[in-house]
């Protein structure tokens, strides 16, 4: 590029460099999209805009991609490196330039015909300034339609800092030429496909237009389901039809979001400023699969785990910065207090009560509102656990909203609904101290403005955040496979509950929890906490801690928990240095070296972070515990032990393997333990390597408290086979509390009611007990004896003496 064009672009770039601060999606386009910079690259943009072209150029230069303003020279022919699909509108509409995109496509394809070694990568790129979807009434032109020069000037001036450059996966023109030919018809088809691609991309980034709130309410009131519920309300409460209708409108006001693009923009500015000061980084993985779903027209339902109130903001922030529409979020009604409620509502929150029982009008209004969101094409987010996890582990799923999602499918909508499980992880959760108090019996404090301000005042260095998108679950595919007859239940008017709905919803919920855990993220904090809590004195020398972290890291890298889980790429030493900056640990120095200590008052809180990744290390920890306690044991015996205990572990920690897959997984773990030198093999038997016994014992400690808890329940069941389920849960908790006091067990979830409730349900499902009691003492005693060999003698004596004391 030379002469006047260079001067023109330089002059135009002066105001753009001040006004525009764009973001690249994905963050590393060459790496994430597999672009080969040694091969020719040309860019395709939706319409003629020099502002878009220069914004693209800035991102290309920042990411070491070819400059779009520098032409491509191929076989002595100079061709522009960019193609505008559409000429774009003009200020003076009587002048319409001739479109050149088809000619350029044809020129590129023709060069491939004459040069068999040529392979140009065609990269579609869209540049967006602002993402306001507009309202369904009163706005003729949505802001993302093609803008003329004057309109573009104002868009760039006002929205230049809310802009992004979206790179799409490249298309091989060599493949196009070989498969479809190089004539002009193919060039026209290529341009048409590109137009459709950009239209879909705009919809994925902006979402459908927003309804006027009153119009939405009127439409809901006109639905047959709500009309019938209003009549029932009037009849059952002996009130007028108008009063019942007012009640329905009041419920809509309570529930419905009031989405505002300007509030999203403002919040993005505030959160960007806040995150950069509080977090040392937000790590996002597998976002491309969600962008692809949005591009393909799926109705996306985000299903994250729930760690903190911060989840609402973090996930919307991440999605917005991935070029996706922030979802409508189901938030607990407890968050609907001033000023948080109105703010959250404008950010897309719709509010849900803890229970729908006994209020048919409320459940009908909520279900119809949720169905309306789906039918209009808005993405939705809800926490399938129902509330925040107080222990750091996943809670048993609450299936009400999930059931309504499937009922929405049974209304006969055309867009496919896909559930996207999401693992959210933190190195610091601001509520963790409150969680520990609640687990010890303190009353949950009601959310309010003073509480929110106290929480905000405690925000300090929060370390790193993690958002990992798990394997999506297309609902239609799932139902086709598991309930082939599901289409017979489609009813566009009534919300029906076919016999297959409840068991299917339960299975989907359990599968989602497994997929959330599959996307787990190990980090400096949860790895260091796991190692230090494994030590009896909650302290290790720096060398011991480094060795233990190396053990965990190697285990997770060489035998990954799943293809979606993530492990830090840095060294153990770097992880320790980072964790020490979080000010959770103490360091004592002596003449020999550093001792890293987890203070007693912090130990209970740090179990939360350990529990975030307990599932990722449970199987290797259990193997290590079996080998450590037996000293010498065959592979077959290890498999037998694991197969007996696995159903309980799977239900408690939502582990991913079926029983048939255990043998292969244990073989891989055995090879890794041998590779690390933690164990040795003699014949068919595995035994401890004395020189690495401390590392193996610390690894085994990850299963210690779980095995103790199982031993408690199986001992009580063996001692009193006729005990009923409720009593078994209660006595197990009482004995667990006693054990925690006598043996210094710091984990508050050790005697958590939900953990024992889940365990007892699994024992029923596995046939150890019936609903009325009547356990088979022979079987339960066998399992107890197996567990007794895996726990220390002092703990075993405490457990066995409990029933004797009675």
From Swiss-Prot:
It is a peripheral membrane protein. It catalyses: sn-glycerol 3-phosphate + an acyl-CoA = a 1-acyl-sn-glycero-3-phosphate + CoA. It is found in: Cell inner membrane. Keywords: Acyltransferase, Cell inner membrane, Cell membrane, Lipid biosynthesis, Lipid metabolism, Membrane, Phospholipid biosynthesis, Phospholipid metabolism, Transferase. Its EC number is 2.3.1.15. A motif (HXXXXD motif) lies at residues 305-310. Its main location: membrane. It comes from the Bacteria. One of its GO terms (molecular function) is glycerol-3-phosphate O-acyltransferase activity. The HXXXXD motif is essential for acyltransferase activity and may constitute the binding site for the phosphate moiety of the glycerol-3-phosphate. Belongs to the GPAT/DAPAT family. This is Glycerol-3-phosphate acyltransferase. It comes from Enterobacter sp. (strain 638).
């Amino acid at each position: 590029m030379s002469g006047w064009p260079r001067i023109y672009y330089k002059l135009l770039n002066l105001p753009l460099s001040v006004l525009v601060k764009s973001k690249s999606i994905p963050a590393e386009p060459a790496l994430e999209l597999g672009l080969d910079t040694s091969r020719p690259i040309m860019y395709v943009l939706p319409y003629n805009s020099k502002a878009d072209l220069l914004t693209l150029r800035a991102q290309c230069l920042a990411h070491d991609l070819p400059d779009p303003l520098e032409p491509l020279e191929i076989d002595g022919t100079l061709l522009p490196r960019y193609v505008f699909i559409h000429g774009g509108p003009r200020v003076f509409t009587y002048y319409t330039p001739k479109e050149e995109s088809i000619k350029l496509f044809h020129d590129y394809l023709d060069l491939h015909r004459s040069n068999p070694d040529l392979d140009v990568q065609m990269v579609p790129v869209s540049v967006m300034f602002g993402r306001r979807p507009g309202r369904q009434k009163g706005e003729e032109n949505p802001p993302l339609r093609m803008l003329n020069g004057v309109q573009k000037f104002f868009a760039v001036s006002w929205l230049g800092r809310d802009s992004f450059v979206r790179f799409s996966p490249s298309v091989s023109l060599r493949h196009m030429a070989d498969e479809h030919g190089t004539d002009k018809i193919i060039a026209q088809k290529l341009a048409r496909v590109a137009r459709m691609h950009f239209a879909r991309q705009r919809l994925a980034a902006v979402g459908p237009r927003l309804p006027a709130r009153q119009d939405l309410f009127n439409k809901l009131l006109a639905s047959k389901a709500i009309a019938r519920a209003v009549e029932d309300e009037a009849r059952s409460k002996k009130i007028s039809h108008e009063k019942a209708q007012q009640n329905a409108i009041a419920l809509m006001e309570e529930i419905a979001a009031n989405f505002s693009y300007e509030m999203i923009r403002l919040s993005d500015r505030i959160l960007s400023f806040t995150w950069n000061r509080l977090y040392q980084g937000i790590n996002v993985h597998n976002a491309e699969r969600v962008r692809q779903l949005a591009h393909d027209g799926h109705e996306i339902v985000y299903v994250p785990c729930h760690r903190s109130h911060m989840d609402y903001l973090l996930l919307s922030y991440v999605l917005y910065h991935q070029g996706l529409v922030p979802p409508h979020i189901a938030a607990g009604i407890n968050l609907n207090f001033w000023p948080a409620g109105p703010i959250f509502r404008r950010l897309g929150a719709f509010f849900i009560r803890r229970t729908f029982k006994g209020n048919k009008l409320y459940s009908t209004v909520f279900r119809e509102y949720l169905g309306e969101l789906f039918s209009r094409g808005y993405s939705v987010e809800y926490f399938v656990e129902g509330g925040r996890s107080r222990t750091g582990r996943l809670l048993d799923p609450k299936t009400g909203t999930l059931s309504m999602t499937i009922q929405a499918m049974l209304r006969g909508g055309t867009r496919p609904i896909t559930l996207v499980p999401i693992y959210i992880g933190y190195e610091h959760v601001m509520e963790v101290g409150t969680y520990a108090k609640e687990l010890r019996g303190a009353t949950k404090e009601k959310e309010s403005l003073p509480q929110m301000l106290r929480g905000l005042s405690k925000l300090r260095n929060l370390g790193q955040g993690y958002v990992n998108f798990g394997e999506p679950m297309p609902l239609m595919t799932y139902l086709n496979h598991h309930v082939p007859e599901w289409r017979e239940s489609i009813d566009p008017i009534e919300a029906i509950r076919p016999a297959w709905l409840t068991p299917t919803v339960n299975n989907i919920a359990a599968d989602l929890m497994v997929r959330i855990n599959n996307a787990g993220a190990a980090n400096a904090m949860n790895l260091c906490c796991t190692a230090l809590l494994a030590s009896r004195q909650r302290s290790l020398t720096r060398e011991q801690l480094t060795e233990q972290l190396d053990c965990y890291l190697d285990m997770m890298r060489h035998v990954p928990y799943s293809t979606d889980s993530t492990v830090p790429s840095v060294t153990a030493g770097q992880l320790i240095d980072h964790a020490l900056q979080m000010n959770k640990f103490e360091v004592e120095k002596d003449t020999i070296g550093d001792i890293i200590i987890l203070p007693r008052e912090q130990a209970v809180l740090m179990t939360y972070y350990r529990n975030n990744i307990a599932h990722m290390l449970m199987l290797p920890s259990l193997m290590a515990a079996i080998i450590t306690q037996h000293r010498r044991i065959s592979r077959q015996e290890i498999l037998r032990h694991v197969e007996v205990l696995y159903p309980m572990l799977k239900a408690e920690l939502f582990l991913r393997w079926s029983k048939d897959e255990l043998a292969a997984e244990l073989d891989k773990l055995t090879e890794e333990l041998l590779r690390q030198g933690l164990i040795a093999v003699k014949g068919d038997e595995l035994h401890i390597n004395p020189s690495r016994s401390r590392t193996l014992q610390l690894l085994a400690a990850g299963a210690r408290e779980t095995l103790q808890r199982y031993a408690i329940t199986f001992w009580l069941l063996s001692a009193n086979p006729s005990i009923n389920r409720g009593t078994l849960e209660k006595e197990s908790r009482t004995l667990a509390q006693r054990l925690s006091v006598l043996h210094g067990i710091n984990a508050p979830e050790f005697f958590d009611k939900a953990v024992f409730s889940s365990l007892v349900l699994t024992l029923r499902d596995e046939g150890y007990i019936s609903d009325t009691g009547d356990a088979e003492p022979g079987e339960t005693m066998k399992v107890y004896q197996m567990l007794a060999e895996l726990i220390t003698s002092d703990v075993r004596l405490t457990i066995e003496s409990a029933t004797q004391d009675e």
